[in-house]
Swiss-Prot record:
Membrane-crossing residue ranges in chain numbering: 4-24, 45-65, 75-95, 117-137, 171-191, 217-237, 253-275, 280-299
Protein name per its UniProtKB record: Uncharacterized membrane protein YvoD
Assigned GO CC terms: plasma membrane
Protein's membrane topology: Multi-pass membrane protein
């Protein structure tokens, strides 16, 4: 048990270090840019487009960071902005569906999934969900409170003050990251080394069949749901090869997982943003289930002779 704990602790610190190298400079840079004309110019340029999603122009900053880098970079961008609870929730939903596009799309390509399909699903889900939430939710107008980040005080009047503000926000962002990631990595290490991931795989078999996939897809699903697409890439690729998962089932699995993966981590990381995370999780799971079942049904209806025959 001690070895497992230490291995998980080491993985937690390693992950914190890796992601902290993104969180710290991104938070520092974006905070400093807020005091320059660059941010105002960018906001004016994209405000009309962001209005479709019920967001202010500056909300595009975390969207770009999250999609080009990762979810943590997007959250770092949010931490530097004064947004309403509704805006933060919409951003959280969009980023939960659509983040880390470069790396996670590459993972999809490695198991034979068309990158265009994955991008279309993720970007489409993010856009549609934002528009729907903006239309049906009329609350959440109060300013969001960001965990350790205190309410904004008077703007600093010197470059030294600006730098101090940026360093403080960047440091607190890394501390919040460590408080979430380290315990999470320890738990995942125990699950992996004690064989619980394989047990979850067996338990998940009926669910994968309900979604229209064969039960040999369950290990891939468990890995994606618990670890995520980026961190679980190696395990998922090996599971596809070892279990003989068909191209159809792999495509369906990835469609589900791009909408709902790393359900523990990608939900908990939003807690410091001061938004309700249970509705966020419910939206992800419900969307993933309904979308996957609909595509599986349509695929079976259009190509009944191909189901289960193609292998990667």
């Amino acid at each position: 048990m001690k070895k497992i704990f230490l291995a998980g602790l080491a993985a937690g610190f390693q992950t914190t270090w890796t992601l902290g190298k993104v969180i710290f400079p991104v938070t520092l840079l974006v905070t400093l840019l807020q005091h320059t004309p660059v941010m105002d110019w960018l906001v004016r340029l994209i405000t009309p487009v962001m209005g479709l999603f019920g967001l202010s122009g500056e909300a595009a900053i975390p969207l770009v960071l999250g999609n080009m880098l990762n979810l943590y970079a997007g959250i770092a961008g949010i931490l530097t902005l004064d947004l309403s609870v509704k805006e933060v929730f919409i951003l959280a939903v969009m980023l939960s569906f659509c983040h880390n596009l470069i790396i996670e799309s590459t993972v999809a390509a490695k198991v034979g999934i068309r990158i265009g399909v994955i991008l279309a699903v993720r970007i489409g889900l993010a856009a549609v969900s934002a528009i729907v939430i903006n239309l049906i939710w009329h609350g959440g107008k109060e300013t969001a409170q960001y965990g350790f980040i205190a309410a904004k005080s008077a703007a600093p009047d010197s470059w030294l003050g600006m730098l101090a503000e940026a360093l403080t926000k960047a440091g607190l962002g890394v501390l919040q990251l460590a408080a979430i990631v380290i315990p999470l990595m320890i738990i995942i290490q125990f699950l992996r080394d004690l064989g619980w991931l394989y047990r979850f795989s067996r338990w998940l078999s009926p669910f994968t069949q309900l979604l229209g996939m064969n039960k040999n897809t369950s290990m891939t699903m468990v890995t994606g749901l618990t670890i995520g697409l980026a961190y679980g890439a190696g395990v998922m690729i090996k599971a596809v090869e070892d279990d003989g998962v068909s191209k159809r089932d792999m495509t369906l699995a990835f469609i589900f997982l791009v909408a709902c993966h790393a359900v523990v981590e990608d939900t908990l990381v939003f807690i410091p943003l001061g938004i309700p995370v249970w509705p966020l999780l419910l939206i992800r799971v419900t969307t993933a289930v309904l979308l996957t079942m609909a595509i599986a049904h349509t695929w079976k209806k259009w190509k009944p002779s191909a189901v289960g025959k193609e292998a990667i």
